């Protein structure tokens, strides 16, 4: 894929950068793998806002993606690469030799016609899924499980990947894009290569309306609110924050560590912010 800078034919097009999608399938998605997706607009069952800045947006179906890749030893042919509105990565439709079809996260470099396999005996080839114990040290991987059989949870977004650093006993050490080094059970599965659509990070939406299409509502700064609404609010005329940046509920907004899961602390070998002061 490549990117294209749009000509400034209007205010909304000026500065817009898009990802070229010539290689993507232009037809309708595979219907048996679609599910209804209800929009909550950031509200809970009482109608109260639980997540700000959500609402509206285009309706779309959820594409059921196979994160487990548990059809071992059965070759699957890539039928097509598709756009998925639910994630930044593209998805690939696989047709297995027994006739079953499944969606997977499309790895970088995969094209229609490629043949993929999963299982302990699979070759070390981009798109194949194996247990980590069968993957050589130094291999770039993505779609990594955190618990055996649960399905991929790590490195699933566009351009994401991780590197297998070492294997010792029942655990392997994996370095994530954030710099964090984490221990993963060697029976967990991972896919060879990195996620495609790496140019996603270079995209510029060009106008506010593009965010509204995505269901993202405007974000109001705290300094322009009243004191009752935000800790930064109030003052006569334009004033600064007068304190460290915080959320509407007083939680520090810059660099404050919010992780609170001591049960799995021993699985983190090196924290992602270990080089920050």
Curated annotation (Swiss-Prot):
One of its GO terms (molecular function) is transferase activity. Residues 37-60, 223-264 are annotated as: Disordered. One of its GO terms (biological process) is cytoplasmic translation. Disulfide bonds: none annotated. GO terms for cellular component: cytosolic large ribosomal subunit. SUPFAM superfamilies: Nucleic acid-binding proteins, Translation proteins SH3-like domain. SMART domains: Ribosomal_L2, Ribosomal_L2_C. Part of the 50S ribosomal subunit. Forms a bridge to the 30S subunit in the 70S ribosome. This is Large ribosomal subunit protein uL2. It comes from Neisseria meningitidis serogroup B (strain ATCC BAA-335 / MC58). The gene is rplB.
């Amino acid at each position: 894929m490549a990117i294209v800078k749009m000509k400034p034919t209007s205010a909304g097009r000026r500065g817009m950068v898009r990802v070229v999608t010539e290689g993507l399938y232009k037809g309708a998605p595979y219907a048996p793998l679609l599910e209804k997706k209800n929009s909550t607009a950031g509200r809970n069952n009482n109608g109260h806002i639980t997540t700000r800045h959500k609402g509206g947006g285009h309706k779309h179906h959820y594409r059921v993606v196979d994160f487990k890749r548990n059809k071992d030893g059965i070759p699957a042919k890539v039928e097509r690469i598709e756009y998925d509105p639910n994630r930044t990565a593209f998805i690939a439709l696989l047709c297995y030799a027994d006739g079953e079809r499944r969606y997977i996260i499309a790895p970088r470099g995969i094209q229609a016609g490629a043949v993929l396999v999963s299982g302990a005996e699979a070759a070390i080839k981009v798109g194949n899924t194996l247990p980590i114990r069968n993957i050589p040290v130094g291999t770039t991987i993505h779609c990594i499980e955190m618990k055996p059989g649960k399905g991929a949870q790590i490195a699933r977004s566009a351009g994401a990947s991780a590197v297998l650093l070492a294997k010792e006993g029942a655990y392997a050490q994996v370095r994530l894009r954030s710099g964090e080094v984490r221990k993963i059970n060697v029976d967990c599965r991972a896919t060879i290569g990195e996620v495609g659509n790496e140019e996603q990070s270079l995209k510029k939406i060009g106008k506010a309306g593009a965010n509204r299409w995505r269901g993202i509502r405007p974000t109001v700064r705290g300094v322009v609110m009243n004191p009752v609404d935000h800790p930064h609010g109030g003052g006569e005329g334009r004033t600064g924050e007068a304190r460290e940046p915080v959320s509407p509920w007083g939680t520090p907004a810059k660099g404050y560590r919010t992780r609170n899961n001591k049960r799995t602390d021993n699985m983190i070998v090196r924290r992602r912010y270990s080089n920050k002061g």
